[in-house]
């Protein structure tokens, strides 16, 4: 399995209330797997794996509210796989699953690419970052 493409297809960010750092959640959902046609591949096959990367902000005071602070990034990963790997992916997807031995690498590339984009959006609309930043502190002298 080799990643040959990563595409962001939709970006959405919304701030509808001032957030008081109650809970921030990050989630990745795989939404579809399908064969992709690439003429340059001779012995291998290409798969397009669609995903959603979501950052949600919950305010403890606003239970069941329609107000939401969120960042949503939808995209796809293009994989070059062997014919056997392709069959394995498509068979697993019938149960809406990704093969366990392949999922970790896919999650990591999505986190790497989308977290950077989400941090930029959070900064632009003044949401708390979903990842803590390192901070420099004064050293205490004895």
Which functions belong to the PLM regions below?
Residues 1-109, 123-142:
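N-terminal intrinsically disordered, cationic/polar leader segments
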Residues 111, 115-117:
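Helix-rich interaction surfaces within compact, conserved domain-sized segments
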Residues 118-122:
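Amphipathic alpha-helical interface segments used for dimerization/assembly
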